[in-house]
Amino acid sequence: MRDLIFEIGTEEIPAGYLEPAYAQMRDKFTQKAKDLRIAHGAVKVMGTPRRLTLIVSDVAESQEDIKEELLGPSKKAAYDANGNFTKAAEGFARSKGVAPSDLKVVNTPKGEYLMLIREVVGQGSLGLLPDVLGEIIKELSFPKSMRWGANSLSFVRPIQWILALFGSDIVAIEHEGIKASNLSSGHRFHANNTFVVESVASYFEQLEKHKVVVDPKVRRELVVQEINAALQANTDLVGGTVAVDEA
C-alpha cells in the first residue's frame, strides 16, 4: 500500500468556492476508487486559495481480484440437435475472447444457461490513477469557471501546476498541456518558488518551510490567535477574544 497526494495549483480561487471543492474532490475520489475496486484508507482534503489538495492513505497497489460470471444464451439456444455449439454460443464465446468449450452450463431461475466463469486479476493502481485524477479535474464544478489560452476545458481559475504522487512515483496526468510532477509551490509573497515533494510527510514539511498553511482549520486558528494577540497588545482596547464565523 502507498499514500497518494494530489494537488491542483491555480491562480487565486474565491474563498467561498474552496469548501465545496474539497468535498467534491473527496466524494469523487471515493466513488471512483469504489467503482474500480481500489481499496484505500482515510481520505483528506484541504487547500488554500492557490491549491486544492487530496491526500489518501494506504491505497492498494492494485485492484481487488474478482470472479466474473457472465451469463450467455440459454442451453436450448446454445446447442443444436446434434449437441454441437450453435452460432449463438460461438458468438458469445468469441465476444468474451474464449472458446465455446470454456463455457459452463448453470441453473438459473429461468432455466439452464451457458455462463463464462473466470478470475479477473486486478490492474495496477499506478496505471489507473491517471484517469481517476484526470477525471476529477474535469468534473469539479464551481459557481463560475473560465477558459484561458487555447484550452478547450474550463476551470475555476487557470491551473499553474499539478502535483500527483503515488508513493514516490509520479502519476502520469496531463491536463491541457500541464504534466503532473513532484513539484509544488510556496507562498505567493513570502516564498514564491517551487520545491520537490517526495512523500506526504515531505509535502507538509516543505509547505511549512515555504510559509504555506494548507489545513483550513489550522489556518483559522492561527488567524484567531494573531487577532487576539493584537487586541491584547493594544492598551487602548478593552480585552476580549475574537470569534471566527465558520460559515
Tell what function each PLM region has.
Residues 1-247:
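Long, basic N-terminal domains or extensions that often function
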